[in-house]
Amino acid sequence: MTRRLLVTAALPYANGPIHIGHLVEYLQTDIWVRFQKLRGNRCLYICADDTHGTAIMIRARGEGRSEIELIEETSEAHQRDFAGFGIEFDHYGSTNSEENRTLCHQIWKSLRDADLVVERSVEQLYDPEAETFLADRFVRGTCPKCGTPNQAGDNCNCGHTYSPTELIDPVSTLSGATPIIKEAEHLFVELEKLHDFLSEWVSNSGALQPETANYLKGHFLADELRDWDISRPAPYFGFEIPDAPGNYWYVWFDAPIGYIASTQQWCDANGEDLADWWKSDDCEVHHFIGKDITYFHTLFWPGMLKTAGFSLPTKVHIHGFLNVNGKKMSKSDGTFVKAETFLKHIDPSALRYFYATKLSSRVEDLDLGVDEFVEKVNSDLVGKVVNLASRVGKFASRTGLAPSYPEDGGLFQAAAAKGDEIASAYEDGEFSKAMRLIMELADAANPFVEHAKPWEMNKAPERQDELRDVCTVALNLFRQLAVYLAPVLPELAKKCGDLLGEPITSWEQSQTPLVDRGVNKFQRMMDRVKTEDLEAMMEESKDEAAQETGAAATNPFNDSDQPLKDEPLADEITIDDFMKVDLRVARVLSAEHVPEANKLLKLTLGLGGDETRQVFAGIKAAYDPEKLVGRLVVMVANLKPRKMRFGLSEGMVTAAGPGGEEVFVLGIDEGALPGQRVH
């Protein structure tokens, strides 16, 4: 029976490029989806960019552009990289969409109606230099449980989770400053009220790998579940919570809802009903994720889905991390390789195959050993699989395929009989097992060609029928391998289809040989991977890292150069020129609108004692008058008074910015006194 499957990979964060570590997941998912489609199942591969949060806001601010510009540019780059590796999504969206906003409202209302949301004041880390509350990812410190230094803001490598305020010696990664603790109102989901449901789902649904279920039962479900902090105060880039103005949904609330929102976009474009994919017992929901985001997808997410009436995950496929040469990916070693850089040097099919040889259904880290990579790809793909076609391809273009399938010693039928076992391995996520089984078939097929010696038959006119038979067997065995490898190597499957004049579209094509047809001109199927190409790739990665480090050293906060371009530095002046300008600290005693002026506010500034100045400042679009009263500002106190039709202006308030709403009055630290000169 045809199955219907909704498949997702974790949404890549729109704050940086795709690298080979990310690709473990997207290739794993793509392989599984392609297998399901090859088997005739109806399968949607849904993804989107994860676009909200403080990181996006901070980066956009530093680059002098809007968050929208940043996430749109990043989305284009992500999709370009994915396409380069043959990763085919049925739909790729963005969490910053109206569909996602609507669904967030809907699910939020469900949580409210279920009495799962509470509000309370919490202490939160605040960066006094960056002037923002710090998300977990922007804090590092010593784990309060095991004492390991330089750990993330919300969890340690030891498996312990905590609040950022519990960290020992916390440091802001935005500015390097020591954060201070400030109180803010936050909204929480009371997960403990869902404890019984989550415990039952984790233990008995079959959705989780055994090691994952045991981890959750031992680390989380054995105790009372902590409330989930679901909101963040302004400033924050995201969706404002409709019934809590000034507060925004935490990125981990709206990000997984993006799975549903992207499906909604696909449904709208294809005339389908979202309920058939997210509220139907006839549809399976499969999530592929990394082990670092396990508890978001296995506790918070099922709780949200259950409460809002959406389908629960049928399976959460969790994978480990990528190491290179037995170590963590390293920029200094050149092993932190961007997808774009890899594509400049190496055939992406090589990485697709290598990852497939390493992936299993278990939560295990993968190791990309450079020497092993070269050996495995060249030996398996070029030396075995492609070798079958390349040794007879040119001859077959002349002879065509035999009218009936020749005697091959049972090779084709034996390979056909392995189809179910290979399919079962794919289905279970045991890609490494599937690759081993396929290579065993390649090992059995190659001796047939070696013993037949078609290159010698080609020299003898009387042996052309024999040559045609050998070509027929060899190309059909090659085609079987291409079908079995099609989920992993779609480009090779396409070339096989082009050669034999029949595209590979179904797993069942592995069960019946092709006969009595012509063969197209043989084209080179795959090149060997060269060690020097890998070395060049890693050298380029080192250079990229060095350039980024150099840029960070001269501009550690990633400040944009656009303001300087808009208003270049003025000509040099002497200290005597500067001393002519009398800058003074002043306090705003009163502020009011000027009805006749669109841009001006009328300010009365106190310089201490009875000394005051009346100033007209072009800051109306940026400031409410009442919010200025009492502030300390810096004014030019010796500017010649200027008579205006609204009154006399006796100075100037200093401010930065291009104008309009983007005007920022210069302040001064507390302790300074009105009347003091600014030197």
UniProtKB/Swiss-Prot annotation:
Positions contributing to ATP binding: 331
Protein name stated in the entry: Methionine--tRNA ligase
Ranges spanned by the short sequence motif 'HIGH' region, renumbered to the chain: 12-22
Region (Disordered): 537-564
Classification of source organism: Bacteria, Pseudomonadati, Planctomycetota, Planctomycetia, Pirellulales
Name of one Pfam family that matches: tRNA-synt_1g
Cofactor binding note: Binds 1 zinc ion per subunit.
Keyword ATP-binding: yes
Top-level taxon of the source organism: Bacteria
Gene: metG
